[in-house]
Amino acid sequence: MLALFLCVFLSLTSPIIMSWKQILKDYTYFLKIERALSVNSIKSYQLDIEKLIAYLEEYNIKASPITIGKDELTQFNYHIAKSLNARSQSRLISGLKGFFNYLIFEDYRLDNPMDTIESPKIGRKLPDTISTEDIDNLIAAIDYTKAEGERNKAILETLYGCGLRVSELTDLKLSDLYFKEGFIKVTGKGNKQRFVPITETTIDYINNYVYNSRLQLKINPDFSDILFLNRRGKQLTRAMIFTIIKQLAVKINLNKTISPHTFRHSFATHLLENGADLRAIQQMLGHESITTTEIYMHIDRTHLHTAINKFHPRS
């Protein structure tokens, strides 16, 4: 209760926005130390609260983290609904509920004003995928006269051949490669590690990059163990991977928007279509729950309908 008293006192004697920013700083520390979340997850939660702070500033609403109520937050919800789709809005609401639960946990508040605010109903969005032909065309479109050509080929093949998240790809280290055993060690969400099998094709592409163009780089000592590097010998960013893929998609006139995650979805879908066990796919993707992996069953049903229409004698 002392923390509650002090926070109310500070909210009356300090600038309201500063009190938001101080508590946001404390919350960020909590997410990092107590919950051990990844940098990207923490940034997402920060952005949720920063959007609320910006809204309060824009409309000159005098409310601190302690005094803000459901009326102000309901209006904020209406405000964000104008610019966010249902899925993004639902995620933001969930993030703010977590923030106010933290304030209750720290005795700053007695209630969660977000409890009465419902998330919009959203359907289960099926992942976007591309065909093996599309993937071959993307790889063929790489300019191998440039120094980064071999690297980009290895990147695309690793995304598709191992089903990695983009952050898992950029964090991949040379010391994570167990080619003799046919596996790579992947560090996923929550710093959880898993071993993912790797094909001979992907091994060849990575080795070609490692023992050729990568050797030509002046590698920054801080990134000597990082597999995929930029021209300056530093770790590639997630944004750069997105850019590489986007440029190749434009180059082959691919009539859909794709991202690094499209390769991960395609990896899982193509395995399932060709008879792979769902549990095995779950382990390779690093999903906590089989329910998350089951979404690929919905995609595969189209494939099953095609099969029965083509091969069943009564179709």
Language model features by range: what are they?
Residues 5-315:
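Conserved catalytic core of the tyrosine transesterase superfamily
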